[in-house]
A protein has these predicted regions:
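Acidic/polar N-terminal loop/beta-strand segments that form early-domain functional surfaces
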Residues: 49-51, 116, 142
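A conserved amphipathic terminal alpha-helix motif
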Residues: 153-189
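Short aromatic-glycine motifs in intrinsically disordered, low-complexity regions
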Residues: 84-94
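Hydrophobic-ligand binding "helix-grip"
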Residues: 93-133
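Beta-strand/loop substructures that line and gate deep hydrophobic ligand-binding cavities in soluble
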Residues: 118-165
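Hydrophobic ligand-binding cavity/cleft-lining segments
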Residues: 4, 8-84
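Intrinsic-disorder/low-complexity, polar/charged segments enriched in Ser/Thr/Lys/Arg/Asp/Glu/Gln
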Residues: 39-45, 110, 134-138
Length: 189
């Protein structure tokens, strides 16, 4: 057991370093069902000094310059344009779709999105850190396997397997960009 001041110092050190790390999917996570059913599922987290609402996190995540590039690609690749205002509506809970995703489930501190083909899930969650030292931001993904019509076996497919390294790096970049944006916003207030 560590003291409150040690916990605060640990959060400050992690937030200052901008560390994004792989972490277990929390037991209460909306994404957990996919890990349990054999889908590929991952989870990354980072800590932010200060109180960050789930709404603020979702909006920051989908409006970073990194994610805006993905939105631009989706606009042309699958004819699914999106705006910062739509990201804000998604964050506020007044929209059930955004770019190439639709809301599969949401709670006070979580959002689970499904892509337009039903193969991938994106998940965001916030959780307060012990002693009010800050907020933990989570980002995870799931890829639902397809069933081979001949063998009946499930598999993720060669395209996903080939892109897994990129996916892991990109996930860390996205979460780091959201964390940086939120830290900047918190510093301005």
């Amino acid at each position: 057991s560590c003291s409150c001041s040690e916990t605060v110092m640990q959060v400050q050190a992690a937030a200052a370093s901008g560390s994004v790390r792989s972490c277990p999917i929390p037991a209460n996570a909306l994404l957990e069902q996919y890990r349990q059913d054999g889908s590929y599922a991952d989870c990354y987290c980072t800590d932010v000094i200060g109180d960050v609402s789930h709404e603020r996190y979702v909006e920051a995540f989908y409006t970073t310059s990194v994610f805006k590039l993905e939105r631009l690609i989706l606009r042309f690749a699958v004819s699914r344009p999106s705006t910062d205002a739509q990201a804000a509506q998604l964050a506020q809970g007044t929209a059930d779709s955004f770019a190439a995703w639709s809301v599969e489930a949401r709670s006070d501190n979580q959002l689970l999105l499904c892509d337009l083909h039903g193969r991938t899930r994106s998940w965001l969650m916030t959780a307060p850190l012990e002693n009010g030292a800050g907020t933990r931001l989570y980002f995870g993904s799931a890829v639902v396997p397809t069933r081979d019509k001949k063998s009946g076996e499930t598999r993720l497919g060669p395209a996903f397997s080939g892109l897994l390294g990129f996916h892991r790096l990109y996930s860390k970049i996205l979460l780091s960009a959201a964390r940086s944006r939120l830290q900047s916003q918190l510093a301005d207030h």
